[in-house]
Amino acid sequence: MSQTVFITGTSMGIGAAAVRLFAQRGWNVAATLRNPADATFTDLPTVRVYALDVTDEAAVMRVVQQAHQDFGGLDVILNNAGYGIVGPFESATDAQVQQQFATNLFGVFSVTRAALPLLRAQQSGVIINVTSVGGRTAFPLNSLYHATKFGLDGFSEALWYELAPFGIRVKVVAPGGVATDFATRSLQMTVDPADDANPYIGQVRSVLDAFSSHGGTYSSAEQIAEVIYTAATDDSAQLRYLAGADAQQLLQTKAEMSEQDFMSMIRQNFGLA
């Protein structure tokens, strides 16, 4: 019998790549996204598309239960929906702060809470949370994004312990840079980069330039999806999976350097020294 994966945030990038990979390897896929018209995988016969905004808790409960009913069970929950906000924290609006947490963190909480009774009942399942290398180290002007990803990493580690007695495994996949349109379509700013009067504008432009200049080192969404598939199928108790050579190199460098030296290096890399 085919297994089923429930995936959030499938309109593009890692989510869309994961849908295709799981489907190509014989899985049933419950693919969720805010606007089903954006789905690029309707040609795949084992994929069913569901409209879902993960910040709508009632909708999350309804869609998770519907997918469970449609497929006769759920084996893997892939919490992938998320986006980034870049810019000085001082310039962030309350709405931006709340929306960043609602999508990147509270949405994961809602999906996980909706799925847990179903997974406990079958005494099996895998929950995979897509965090980021930014859940293990921080970059300038990404304070809100890092707050959600550090939070998701800690949440996942704690959940690993409490769900193990029920046969449910928790995994974290932490990509480095990903060559998708995340940096355009899924990126918001707390400040207008053209606002010369903003006291942080020099930092803003340096950070944006640094992100752009490193694009050649980023992994493809398909490469990240392969790591996700491994996490879903390796039958191990491993918690964390780094995805991408840049993520592995960065955290290795962090482990080998003093905190002060590492942070000085990050400042230099972002043109802030």
What do these predicted regions represent?
Residues 11-12:
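Conserved glycine-rich cofactor-binding loop
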Residues 52-62, 94:
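The beta1-alpha1 cofactor-binding region of Rossmann-like NAD(H)/NADP(H)-dependent oxidoreductases
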Residues 66-79, 85:
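A glycine-rich helix->loop->beta "capping" turn
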Residues 88-89, 96-98:
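Substrate-binding pocket helix/loop in short-chain dehydrogenase/reductase
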Residues 112, 148:
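Active-site helix of classical SDR
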Residues 132:
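Residue(s) in the substrate-gating loop at a strand-loop-helix junction
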Residues 165-237:
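SDR active-site lid
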